Amino acid sequence: MKILLACEESGVVRDAFSKLGHNAWSCDILPSRSPGQHYQCDVREVLYDDWDMVIAFPPCTDLCVSRARWFEQKRANGDQQRSIEFFMLFANHPCPRVAIENPVGIMSTLYRKPDMVLQPWQYGHGETKATCLWLRGLPLLKPTNIVSGREPRVHRMAPGPERARLRSQTYQGVADAMASQWGLA
C-alpha cells in the first residue's frame, strides 16, 4: 500500500510500515530524524496524491486540553481556528483509509468523539498518555502487550528545547501495532 504519514518527522510509524513492505512516506515541514522516504514540505502539497491510507498526526498545541489555559489567546489570534481547519483537512480527506491521532482535546467536541483512546501501556510501554484516534475504513487497534509500571513520564518532563518533540513522538509499540494491524486493511 502507498501510505502517507502526515506531520511525522520522527519516521517511527513510516519505518514500521516500510519494514512490512509498504510504500510509506512521512511528511513534515521539518526534516526526518531517520533515513527513509520523506517529504519535507507543507503536507497540503502532497495530501491529495494517490494514497491508499493517510495517517495524520496534526500538531496538538492549539487543540489539546493540556494547553487549555492558553485557549483564549489562541482563539483571539486565530491559531486555534487554523489548527481546527488543519485537523479537518484530514477528517474530510477522500482517502478510504484515514486515521487521525491527537491527545484528548477540543476536537472530541468540535468534530466528534474519537473512535478509540489508547494508552502506551497497552503496547509494551509502561507509561500513561491518553491518545485519541479518529478512524475511517480502519479497525480499532487491538492491544499487543499490556504491561504494568504505568508512569505519566511525558507529563513530568522538564522544560527544554526537545520537550515538545519527545512528548509528541509515537511509541514504537503503537507504531508496530498500526503497521501490523492496519497494513492488512
Say what each PLM segment does.
Residues 1-185:
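Conserved active-site and SAM-binding loop architecture
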